[in-house]
Design a protein with these regions (language model features):
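Long alpha-helical rod scaffolds of large eukaryotic non-enzymatic complex subunits
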Residues: 1-270
Length: 270
């Protein structure tokens, strides 16, 4: 069952690793010689580079081992998602899949912190722990690697209507927006917002931009308009744009759709 798989993957694994006596303290001692608690590089000394390289190798060994152990669970989740895109809708299935995956990333985040005693916060410094784990490609999602989630979503949305793409990115931005009160701002909520922001900025917003570009090319740039459509007819229901040139109408529709799917800062920059 799902609950049994979860218990083995996280609860039992945590028990096994924390019962390893001196293993974790030794691992953490090495990591702390290279990074602070938030994964930022410590003040450089003659041997800092050696410890950073050793820590990076341990990160890789740990995450690739987790990836191997969770391979069947990862494949099962993906298959269920693909089934739901057909039995429900691609938008509903994607929402469910994102929520489920964020929970798994959060659990992996917690395990990683307990093993290495650091919480690698997002940072663009090439010397940060975050960048070290981001470079570790796995089939499963982990704190530095959301690419498998993005790839699965994009694969499902590739053949979907543009509106479905917009519904997904719009929901993701709204669902994981800033909490309205401190009571709602739990550690998991903060982490989920971080995952959502990274997923949007690094993957889904560029994907959506490309989807709009393709639609503009198809319905505007390369569209053929019959001569009859060039005639200006009467205004309908008092709407000034109702008798506009067809391509102008379509352009306005696309702008409105983009505006609804994107946060204000991004739609204004367009």
């Amino acid at each position: 069952s799902d609950s049994t798989r979860h218990a083995l993957a996280y609860g039992r694994f945590e028990e096994m690793i924390t019962d390893s006596y001196s293993l974790l303290p030794n691992i953490q001692q090495v990591v702390h010689r290279a990074y602070d608690h938030y994964g930022q590089p410590v003040e450089s000394t003659s041997d800092t580079g050696v410890y950073a390289n050793t820590a990076s190798n341990m990160f890789r060994a740990y995450l690739t081992t987790r990836d191997r152990d969770l391979k069947l669970m990862t494949q099962h989740d993906l298959e269920e998602y693909q089934k739901e895109t057909k039995s429900l809708s691609v938008v509903t299935a994607t929402r469910n899949f994102v929520k489920q995956t964020f929970e798994k990333v959060y659990n992996e985040d917690g395990l990683f912190s307990k093993v290495f005693d650091i919480e690698p916060m997002w940072h663009n410094s090439p010397d940060s722990a975050f960048q070290a784990i981001k470079a570790i490609n796995t089939t499963m999602v982990h704190p530095g690697n959301l690419a498998p989630l993005a790839s699965s979503i994009q694969s499902s949305l590739q053949a979907a209507e543009l509106q479905a793409v917009c519904d997904v990115v719009g929901w993701l931005a709204n669902e994981y927006s800033v909490a309205e009160s401190d009571e709602e701002d739990s550690p998991s909520s903060r982490k989920h917002r971080e995952y959502a922001a990274r997923l949007l900025v690094e993957n889904l917003w560029p994907f959506t931009d490309n989807a709009f570009t393709a639609e503009i090319t198809k319905s505007i740039s390369r569209a053929s308009v019959p001569d009859s459509a060039l005639k200006i007819g009467p205004v309908e229901n008092g709407v000034a744009s109702s008798n506009a040139y067809p391509l102008v109408k379509r352009a306005v529709e696309l702008l409105a759709t983009f505006d609804q799917a994107m946060p204000k800062e991004r739609s204004v920059s367009l």
